[in-house]
């Protein structure tokens, strides 16, 4: 993965830039988030939101969704061509929550998309600032990853619901670009490809004609993105097979599911970025912080520092636990839905519990929920330490990929073992090693069998004090090796439905 000389860093993808040095990257990422902040401040002015209302995460999400919808070219075109009852294709809006006489009230607002686009461009020096839009998409995606389980989607494509740790970014829109592709998990890419192949099986014309040629290019591009996430030669060779198939069908689906399972142990490279809600950037800009001059990074100390000094509120339903709501948002902010809970707990400084034990539903409030009983509370988004976000799967030394619980996709570059029940995972690999990919399958299974749960990943990497911004003295946490930490263990969360 690192061998390609043309690799751009994630921040470069994030900002659509060509190769830049560290200072330029920090400046362009800073420019991106300050544009988001300026846009948010302007929207709060337009909507006449009080300071408290502007810090409400639900209001932030509505404003973010409005700008994403205003710039969704494809959907806008579709809405113009297929007018549906009661939907004005030129308008966008959502619920805004205001404090009236000691109660929260919901107000549905509607704006011209053109107007929203104007405000956004104005906040971004007249540019479209696609990078900022992608950044908001990734924040929404990270929030979905922490909030919902994708069991149904997994089962529909023939995958095992226990592979949920491979599903990072599964709700990202197609138009999220290179930065979006970087944060998608192996399972997400596999699922997108399987859906495509199934359409081809059911629809004779899917791969044919002018449209079919474009479809084919998209298919091969997705295969290459997935191939780039794998770190072993055998996995990559199998991806070449899938990509080059004349007429993708069930054999390719089998291969893809096999590869997804193999990724539970031979983990793929998936990027992690701390993308924060727009209101957080708004608060910082309003307080006079100059992101562009100071520079900003999505994978270093900056987001932690920002969250240490930001007060964000959330609406709370009658029987929800505010501490649990905070954990959910903290995990979303750091893209840590698939991280080992032992590591997250250590960094956060308070115990992070599996989702099955959370007394909280999602952050967004449905339009039919009763506002009378709604309360609000401060989200506790601070941390005890900070750690560098990783873009690798935490596999030990070169080709030998290490172990993963059923399973984690590490977010933080912190030394730990990656416990896993090899028997459980290997049981999924019975039988079928014949066919074109037999030698690769055999090789992959051999590598998985030789992976040891006690191997240590990210050797010598540690967390840092919040005062240690240059990351000079790593603190390597001692983690309870016996206690594996899967967030989705014993899960009862709601499904994600569009």
UniProtKB/Swiss-Prot annotation:
Motif Bipartite nuclear localization signal: chain residues: 198-216
Main location: virion
Matching SUPFAM superfamilies: flu NP-like (SSF161003)
Motif (Unconventional nuclear localization signal): 1-18
Post-translational modification: Late in virus-infected cells, may be cleaved from a 56-kDa protein to a 53-kDa protein by a cellular caspase. This cleavage might be a marker for the onset of apoptosis in infected cells or have a specific function in virus host interaction.
InterPro entries registered for this protein in UniProt: Flu_NP
Keyword Phosphoprotein appears in the UniProt entry: no
Compartments in which it is found: Virion; Host nucleus
UniProt keyword annotations, A-Z: Capsid protein, Helical capsid protein, Host nucleus, Host-virus interaction, Ribonucleoprotein, RNA-binding, Viral nucleoprotein, Viral penetration into host nucleus, Virion, Virus entry into host cell
Domain of life: Viruses
Pfam families: Flu_NP
Biological process terms in GO annotation: symbiont entry into host cell; viral penetration into host nucleus
Residue ranges of the TM segments: none
GO molecular function list: RNA binding; structural molecule activity
This protein's GO CC annotations: helical viral capsid; host cell; host cell nucleus; ribonucleoprotein complex; viral nucleocapsid
Annotated coiled-coil segments of the chain: none
Stretch list, region Disordered: 1-21
Main function: Encapsidates the negative strand viral RNA, protecting it from nucleases. The encapsidated genomic RNA is termed the ribonucleoprotein (RNP) and serves as template for transcription and replication. The RNP needs to be localized in the host nucleus to start an infectious cycle, but is too large to diffuse through the nuclear pore complex. NP comprises at least 2 nuclear localization signals that are responsible for the active RNP import into the nucleus through cellular importin alpha/beta pathway.
Subunit-structure text: Homomultimerizes to form the nucleocapsid. May bind host exportin-1/XPO1. Binds to viral genomic RNA. Protein-RNA contacts are mediated by a combination of electrostatic interactions between positively charged residues and the phosphate backbone and planar interactions between aromatic side chains and bases.
Protein name per the record: Nucleoprotein
UniProt lineage: Viruses, Riboviria, Orthornavirae, Negarnaviricota, Polyploviricotina
Gene that produces this protein: NP
């Amino acid at each position: 993965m690192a061998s390609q000389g043309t690799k751009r860093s994630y921040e470069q993808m994030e900002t659509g830039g060509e190769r830049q040095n560290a200072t330029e990257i920090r400046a362009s990422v800073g420019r991106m988030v300050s544009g988001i902040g300026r846009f948010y401040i302007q929207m709060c002015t337009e909507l006449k939101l009080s300071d408290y209302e502007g810090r409400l995460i639900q209001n932030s999400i509505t404003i973010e969704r409005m700008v994403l919808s205003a710039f969704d070219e494809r959907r806008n075109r579709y809405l113009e061509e297929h007018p549906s009852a009661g939907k004005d294709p030129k308008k966008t809006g959502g619920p805004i929550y205001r404090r009236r006489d000691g109660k929260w009230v919901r107000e549905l607002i509607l704006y011209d998309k053109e107007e929203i686009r104007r405000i956004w461009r104005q906040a971004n020096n007249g540019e479209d600032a696609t990078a900022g839009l992608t950044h908001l998409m990734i924040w929404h995606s990270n929030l979905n990853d922490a909030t919902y389980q994708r069991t149904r989607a997994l089962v529909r494509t023939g995958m095992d619901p226990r592979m949920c740790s491979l599903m990072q970014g599964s709700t990202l829109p197609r138009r999220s670009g290179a930065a979006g592709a970087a944060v998608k998990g192996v399972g997400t890419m596999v699922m997108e490809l399987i859906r495509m192949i199934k359409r081809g099986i059911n629809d004779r014309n899917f791969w044919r004609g002018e449209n079919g040629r474009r479809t084919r290019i998209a298919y091969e591009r997705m295969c290459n993105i997935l191939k780039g996430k794998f770190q072993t030669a055998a996995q990559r060779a199998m991806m070449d097979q899938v990509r080059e198939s004349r007429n993708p069908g069930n054999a390719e689906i089998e291969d893809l599911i096999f590869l997804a399972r193999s990724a539970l142990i031979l983990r793929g490279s998936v990027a992690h970025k701390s993308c924060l809600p727009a209101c957080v950037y708004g608060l910082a800009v309003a307080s006079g912080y100059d992101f562009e001059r100071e520079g900003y990074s999505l994978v270093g100390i900056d987001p932690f520092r920002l969250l240490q000094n930001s007060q964000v509120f959330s609406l709370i339903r009658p029987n929800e636990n505010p501490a649990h709501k905070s954990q959910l948002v903290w995990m979303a902010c750091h893209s840590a839905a698939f991280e080992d809970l032992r590591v997250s707990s250590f960094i956060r400084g308070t115990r992070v519990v599996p989702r099955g034990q959370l007394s909280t539903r999602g952050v967004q409030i449905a339009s039919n929920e009763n506002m009378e009983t709604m309360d609000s509370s401060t989200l506790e988004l601070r941390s005890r330490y900070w750690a560098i976000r990783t873009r690798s799967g935490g596999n030990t030394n070169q080709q030998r990929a290490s172990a993963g619980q059923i399973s984690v996709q590490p977010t933080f570059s912190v030394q730990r073992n990656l416990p896993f029940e090899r028997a459980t995972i290997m049981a999924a690999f019975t039988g079928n090693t014949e066919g074109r990919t037999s030698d690769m399958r055999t090789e992959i299974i051999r590598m998985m069998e030789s992976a040891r749960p006690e191997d240590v990943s990210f050797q010598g990497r540690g967390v840092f004090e919040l005062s240690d911004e240059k990351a000079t003295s790593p603190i390597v946490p001692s983690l309870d090796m016996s206690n594996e930490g899967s967030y989705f263990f014993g899960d009862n969360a709601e499904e994600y439905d569009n």
